[in-house]
Amino acid sequence: MVNLKELSQNEVLELINYVKSLRKQNFSYSQISKKIEIERNIKISKSTIIRWCKNSNNPFNKTKFIDLSPSPELSYIIGVYFGDANIYYRKKTGSYYFRIKVVDKDFVDVVKNSLIKIGLNPTISYVEEKTRSNRWHVEASSKSLYKFLSQNKEELFKVAEKYPEDFLRGFFDSEGYVTSNKIALENYDLELLEFSKELLKKLDVHSTIHIAKKKGTESNIRGEIYHYKDDFYRLSIHRKESVRNFAIKVSFSIKRKRERLQKLLESMDKH
């Protein structure tokens, strides 16, 4: 049996509308409760149904109501989520969070503004760390965003397809980099890279995917020896026109990455 607290924001809204429609059809409160339990395996009390029908209860009093309809900002957040960001549940406080830790202040500013745009109130902090570079943290509390991002990635892809430039910018801001001859992005998730490749193709950006590190390959990270748990993939953009189209249509939010991209274009123009 599913509890109301386990439902997403949109699922609760849909359920409220369904409850009200049943009431208009002259179902009793008890009948509505039983019908929802049988049809949807959702446990909802008679008293809650009464409050909903009389508009005397707001189920979002303790939940930030945010705009999860497709938008450039939400698409960007999804791209960032597939890269550097993570979501987690803090059991002590019973709160759900979206968080990202990065070295670039301009990056966290864009993430912060995107979170604000969809209705959240994120916080930014600067944390000094002994074992790695000091980093900026941006964090926002939202059960609705947590549940939204916890969906199958195919559902998130639907938003990304509506705003491909923003999704790709978020993903490349997180995982992308520029070398002397290419733009590249690395990730364990081959399906995610293939999806990104298709989006790039629609923007006239040719890219290729290959294995950057095979499973089991040894790596030294800050003095610690690690082994790749799975094949690690790289998506690369080499062709001059594709690099140019990427710069025009996607680019980076991060200044240092934009500057490297400009240098790559200047180098390509000389040859």
UniProtKB/Swiss-Prot annotation:
It comes from the Archaea. InterPro entries: Homing_endonucl, Intein_endonuc_central, LAGLIDADG_dom. Signal peptide: none annotated. Residues 77-205 form the DOD-type homing endonuclease domain. One of its GO terms (molecular function) is endonuclease activity. Pfam families: LAGLIDADG_3 (PF14528). This is Uncharacterized protein MJ0398. It comes from Methanocaldococcus jannaschii (strain ATCC 43067 / DSM 2661 / JAL-1 / JCM 10045 / NBRC 100440) (Methanococcus jannaschii). The lineage of its organism: Archaea, Methanobacteriati, Methanobacteriota, Methanomada group, Methanococci.
